[in-house]
Amino acid sequence: MFARLSTALLAFTLATAVVAAPGGRPSEVEYEQCNGGEIQCCNSYQKADSLDYNTSKLLGLLNIDVKQITAGVGLTCTGINAVGIGGGSSCTQQKVCCTNNKFNGVVALGCSPINVSL
């Protein structure tokens, strides 16, 4: 009896993990939320009006005028593409849509978070 219960519990756990696993591609909802930008996976995201000290210093070192930033800033970002090659297609941190990623992912500007729970 205990073996059957253990087997059933294991099967249920595995089935739940498979159902909860993220898909291989960003959804169409994500693309609709990212008009004119690129979907990025960033280790952190900060709103323009609440940049921390270290982020402000980093932007200064890159000759970016902090006062001119009006949209969010992503830090340590990689691209997410639809095919699943290159930068990868899954994100365990913050998904954002950025319009300016000219700093090789160190800093991405013009970012807004992607709400995937629609």
UniProtKB/Swiss-Prot annotation:
Cystines in this chain: C34-C97, C41-C91, C42-C77, C98-C111
Domain of life: Eukaryota
Keywords, sorted A to Z: Cell wall, Disulfide bond, Glycoprotein, Secreted, Signal
Record GO cellular component, one term: fungal-type cell wall
InterPro entries reported in the protein's UniProt record: Hydrophobin (IPR001338)
Pfam families xrefs: Hydrophobin
Tagged with keyword Signal: yes
Signal peptide limits: 1-20
Glycosylated residue positions: N54, N115
GO MF terms, alphabetically ordered: structural constituent of cell wall
Induction: Expression is light-dependent and positiveley regulated by the GATA transcription factor nsdD2 that binds promoter regulatory sequences containing a GATC motif.
Localisation per UniProt entry: Secreted; Secreted, Cell wall
Keyword 4Fe-4S tagged: no
Family listed: Belongs to the fungal hydrophobin family.
Reported function: Aerial growth, conidiation, and dispersal of filamentous fungi in the environment rely upon a capability of their secreting small amphipathic proteins called hydrophobins (HPBs) with low sequence identity. Class I can self-assemble into an outermost layer of rodlet bundles on aerial cell surfaces, conferring cellular hydrophobicity that supports fungal growth, development and dispersal; whereas Class II form highly ordered films at water-air interfaces through intermolecular interactions but contribute nothing to the rodlet structure.
Subunit structure: Self-assembles to form functional amyloid fibrils called rodlets. Self-assembly into fibrillar rodlets occurs spontaneously at hydrophobic:hydrophilic interfaces and the rodlets further associate laterally to form amphipathic monolayers.
Name of the molecule in the record: Class I hydrophobin 1
